[in-house]
Amino acid sequence: MQQMVPASGYDRAITIFSPEGRLYQVEYAREAVRRGTTAVGIKCKDGVVLAVDRRITSKLIDVSSIEKIFQIDDHIVAATSGLVADARVLIDRARLEAQMNRISYGEAITVEALAKKICDIKQAYTQHGGARPFGLALLITGIDRHSARLFETDPSGALIEYKATAIGSGRPIAMEVLESKYSEDMTVNEGMELALYALSKTTEELKPENIDMAIVKDSGKLVEKISVDEIEKIVKAVYKKVEAEEAEAEKNKGEEDIE
């Protein structure tokens, strides 16, 4: 885990820059994201995929009450990592912005326009005293009149578009997997398998009931939540692939030892 440098008093107000040009409260908010659940987003040739490991910590928790993926509009879905209460506020605001766009302009909001509106709100909370930044990162994705889009927003209000990305505590490991295995030609079905494969590398055991997953396909342009039964099938396929890779690695190691 990255160690935070002593702030020498410059972290007492959100509006004060340190001599190095840093806003420590924003960096602390990013730390909340780094401790959050891992979410993976993948843009495919026929749609987009979001998957989140909800990381259920107690068997007494009702799994159905823990949401990490939220439908914003018919064609837009978002995944969150960070403070749950902050997520609720921004998701509600995103839904409101989508509704207002339909009422004002008679059409659905684009994925990019919605992502920018949320980032504007996040950025404003880095400038005003008496408030704190949102300790939350969002993956906002969907299909609009342009094409499939996938955006990541961070607590500073920065907005970056990706082909595939991850947020949360498992981001470094998941990004290594995505960078090595992602292809722009992959289908949504292949994207779902890759997303769960990346999540499997960030946890000791990937449990289907702990996974939240959604897709949006080019054909229908509608958000579709993936059932636990379907996720279980994909998880089994993922672990078969992992076992095959481990067996191949063990075989190669044995051949090297012989040489």
Curated annotation (Swiss-Prot):
* Activity control note: The formation of the proteasomal ATPase PAN-20S proteasome complex, via the docking of the C-termini of PAN into the intersubunit pockets in the alpha-rings, triggers opening of the gate for substrate entry. Interconversion between the open-gate and close-gate conformations leads to a dynamic regulation of the 20S proteasome proteolysis activity.
A molecular function annotated in GO for this UniProt entry is:
threonine-type endopeptidase activity
Q: What is its main location?
A: cytoplasm
Q: Which UniProt keywords apply?
A: Cytoplasm, Proteasome
> What is a biological process (GO) this protein takes part in?
proteasomal protein catabolic process
Which Pfam family, an example, fits this chain?
Answer: Proteasome_A_N
Q: Where in the cell is it found?
A: Cytoplasm
Q: Which GO terms describe its cellular component?
A: cytoplasm; proteasome core complex, alpha-subunit complex
Q: Which CDD domains match?
A: proteasome_alpha_archeal (cd03756)
Q: How does it assemble?
A: The 20S proteasome core is composed of 14 alpha and 14 beta subunits that assemble into four stacked heptameric rings, resulting in a barrel-shaped structure. The two inner rings, each composed of seven catalytic beta subunits, are sandwiched by two outer rings, each composed of seven alpha subunits. The catalytic chamber with the active sites is on the inside of the barrel. Has a gated structure, the ends of the cylinder being occluded by the N-termini of the alpha-subunits. Is capped at one or both ends by the proteasome regulatory ATPase, PAN.
Give the family this protein belongs to, as stated in its UniProt record.
Belongs to the peptidase T1A family.
| Reported function | Component of the proteasome core, a large protease complex with broad specificity involved in protein degradation.
Protein's UniProt name: Proteasome subunit alpha
Q: Which organism is it from?
A: Methanococcus maripaludis (strain C5 / ATCC BAA-1333)
Output the lineage of the source organism.
Archaea, Methanobacteriati, Methanobacteriota, Methanomada group, Methanococci
Q: Which gene encodes it?
A: psmA
